[in-house]
Every structure is written in C-alpha cells, then in structure tokens.
Amino acid sequence: MRGWLWLLVVLALGGLFWWGMQRNPKELPSVLAKERRPAPDFTLPLLPPYRAEWGEAFRLADHLGKRPIVLNFWASWCYPACYEEAPILEASWRRHREEVLFVGVNTQDKEEEALRFIAQFGLTFPQVYDPRGRVGVDYGMYGVPETFFIDREGRVLAR
C-alpha cells in the first residue's frame, strides 16, 4: 500500500511539472495588470553610476503623476533573455526619455556583476539594486526578465 501511495505522489508531481512546462511564460497572468491595480511603491538604492543624476535612492511614488514608467526586472545571470533585451530597452530609453521613464531593477544579483552588465550594455537609464528580490515579490514577478508598464496615475497597465 505504501509503495502505491509513493508512486501516486511521484506521478502527480510529475504531471504538475509537465503541465507547468507547457505554459507560455509570456501568457502568465498578472493580477496587478488585469485589475489595473496601483503599482506597489518601493524605495531602493540606485547603483553607483546613477547616483550623481538621480540621488542615492529611487522612490517610485516620487515619479508618479509625471509620465508613464517602464519598470524592468533583470539580473546579470539571466542569459540569454536579459542580454537580448538590454540593448532594446536602452535604445527605447534614448528615443523616448522625455515621454517615458525607464527604470531597471537588478534583482537577486551581486552588485559587482550588475555593474559589469550595465557597463557591457552602456545602460544610461536609472538602475536600482534589490539583492533580495523583495520588490519583485510585491509585483508578483515570475522570473527575470520581467517588465511592468505603469501609467501616469501609478496603475499597472501590462506585464
């Protein structure tokens, strides 16, 4: 009897794993976006290259009401996806910086590795540091990279 129970548990877990792997991560729902909920506020330290222009810390609430925000979660160990999208985000920032604020959130990473990544791609939009990934949890992030689009009023429009 005990053997059958163990086999049943293994089969059930295997089935759940298989089902999860069939899902398209781009189609995973975001409750924040679906219900246009307010973006969770946060204050995080800016990485050193951005402090002269943006200050020591970045607080989301200080930037609401001015322009939409593109909030991108990334990590240096996120390969190849983060490496592929970094130049696209930088080009978009350079093209639309007057209309849209881009903010990078380096998450669950080592600061030295994050700085190396930033230098490699010449990222000029502000980058904050969240080594424990707490802000990503507040946003319901599934993994990196993940980008949230926040309107002027501070509501999450899309993920």
Regions found by a protein language model. Name each.
Residues G65, R116-T124, Y129-R159:
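Thiol/disulfide oxidoreductase modules built on the thioredoxin-like
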Residues R67-I69, W74-C78, G143:
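Short pre-active-site segment immediately N-terminal to redox-active cysteine/selenocysteine motifs
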Residues F73-A91:
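Conserved redox-active cysteine motifs that mediate thiol-disulfide chemistry
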Residues A75, T107, D130:
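Active-site loop/turn elements of alpha/beta-hydrolase fold enzymes
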